[in-house]
Amino acid sequence: DFRCPTTWSASKLYCYKPFKEKKTWIEAERFCAKQAENGHLVSIGSAAEADFLDLVIVVNFDKQRYRAWTGLTERNLKWTNGASVSYENLYEPYIRKCFVVQPWEGKSKWYKADCEEKNAFLCKFPKPH
């Protein structure tokens, strides 16, 4: 039975880790890819996964003031792991290209951000079977 590395948080199928170091979106995606096989910026496939990530975020970031890259870009609305968007949690007014999660009323919401901005980020990789 595969165990996530000690500093990573485990769900049934995936390992997750937030990084406070600030990077542009593409720098963060490249960094996540180096962390593990099939590593990417986080994709969020369901409300349950979003709730799990909120717990990971609260433990690792200042829950009032975080801003962290996800693997979603506006260009094709696909996650960096190739998955189509099956669940959305968007906050509308911002029109840019890449997406961050940041707090809104105690939960993480998705906001558009300039891909060149430097932000913290969340990595994810699937547990090998």
UniProtKB/Swiss-Prot annotation:
- What keywords are assigned to this protein? Disulfide bond, Hemostasis impairing toxin, Platelet aggregation inhibiting toxin, Secreted, Toxin
What are this entry's molecular-function GO terms? toxin activity
Q: Which residue pairs form cystines in this protein?
A: 4-15, 32-123, 98-115
Its domain of life?
Eukaryota
Would you name any one GO CC term? extracellular region
Q: Which InterPro entries match?
A: C-type_lectin-like, C-type_lectin-like/link_sf, C-type_lectin/snaclec_domain, CTDL_fold
**Tissue-wise expression:** Expressed by the venom gland.
Q: What broad class describes the main subcellular location of this protein?
A: secreted
Where can this protein be found?
A: Secreted
Q: Which family does it belong to?
A: Belongs to the snaclec family.
What does the UniProt function comment say about this protein? Potent inhibitor of collagen-induced platelet aggregation. It acts by binding to the integrin alpha2A domain and blocks collagen binding to integrin alpha-2/beta-1 (ITGA2/ITGB1). The gamma/delta subunits mainly contribute to this activity.
Q: Provide the protein name.
A: Snaclec rhodocetin subunit beta
Q: What organism, scientifically named, is this protein from?
A: Calloselasma rhodostoma
